[in-house]
Amino acid sequence: MYPLKSKRGFSYSNRRFNSRNIVFNRPVSGKRHDGKRRGGNFVKPNDEPKMLAQRIHENQYGPEFVLAHNSAISTFIPVIHLGQVPKPSRSRSYIKLKRLRFKGTVKIERVQSDLNMDGFMPKVEGVFSMVVVVDRKPHLGPSGCLHTFDELFGARINSHGNLTIVPSLKDRFYIRHVFKRVLSVEKDTLMVDVEGSTTLSNRRYNCWSTFKDLDRESCKGVYDNISKNALLVYYCWMSDTPANASSFVSFDLDYIG
């Protein structure tokens, strides 16, 4: 209440304030809906099949996996064909290698039962080795064969110690896993368990295997069609006494493809 001066004195009057809505013209940043479709980034549907977690099973056994004493063989883990049905298969020209597991047996068998001068049968003492190697740039040489154990590791006698790739081939090959057993056999035969696993990809490193796939006929999983990261397996049996080592090993390769 405020006093107002007049001729008759002071009087009081209520002074009212009416609130007013102040309107500001603000720019509108929303989408315009004028019935017109405007250009933008649209995600095209992917026609390629989804890459799935799968597993390849491979058994390595038979006459070609019988090692005479002081000998070695080389082989590889075959990968699957493109679009092969039923699974396992691969949907692209590359797969992600996750883990390789193996399990099996090795039979050590004496070749001959000759007695020594004391009339006793000598022991069969030796070293059995199985080595998993990654070939970064797979290709066959002029001979059309895989690198031998001696070419890759220097000599078979090196299996008694710490195996390493020869310096001239370190840029192409690297050792992923070594399984080794030092054996002493008094009987004519002995069965040895073989089991292990190795991780090929982890959180810090991914191992991708790629393929050439030039045409439909070449979309295979053989060594000659792999252009990056093939898995090789080397077997070696060293013994001074004549004896054979027969291996039966099953491999399970986990991959995404």
From Swiss-Prot:
Region annotation (Disordered) ranges: 26-47
Q: Where is this region: Interaction with Arabidopsis thaliana NSI protein?
A: 151-188
Going by the UniProt record, its keywords in alphabetical order are: DNA-binding, Host cell membrane, Host cytoplasm, Host membrane, Host nucleus, Host-virus interaction, Membrane, Transport, Viral movement protein
Location of motif Bipartite nuclear localization signal in this chain is: 21-42
A single MF term (Gene Ontology): single-stranded DNA binding
Q: Specify residue ranges for compositional bias: Basic residues.
A: 29-39
- Top-level taxon of the source organism: Viruses
Q: GO CC: one term?
A: host cell
A GO BP term here is:
transport of virus in host, cell to cell
Cellular localization per UniProt: Host nucleus; Host cytoplasm; Host cell membrane
Instruction: Please report, in chain numbering, the residue ranges of the motif Nuclear localization signal.
Output: 81-97
Instruction: Tell me the membrane topology, using the record's own terms.
Output: Peripheral membrane protein
Its function, per the record, reads: Binds to the genomic viral ssDNA, shuttles it into and out of the cell nucleus. Begomoviruses use 2 proteins to transport their DNA from cell to cell. The nuclear shuttle protein (NSP) shuttles it between nucleus and cytoplasm and the movement protein (MP) probably transports the DNA-NSP complex to the cell periphery and facilitates movement across the cell wall.
- Whom does it interact with, and what assembly results? Binds to single-stranded and double-stranded viral DNA. Interacts with the host nuclear shuttle interacting (NSI) protein. This interaction may allow NSP to recruit NSI monomers to the viral genome and thus regulate nuclear export of viral genome by NSP.
Q: Name the family the entry cites.
A: Belongs to the begomovirus nuclear shuttle protein family.
Please give the name of this protein: Nuclear shuttle protein
Protein species of origin: Tomato mottle virus (isolate Florida)
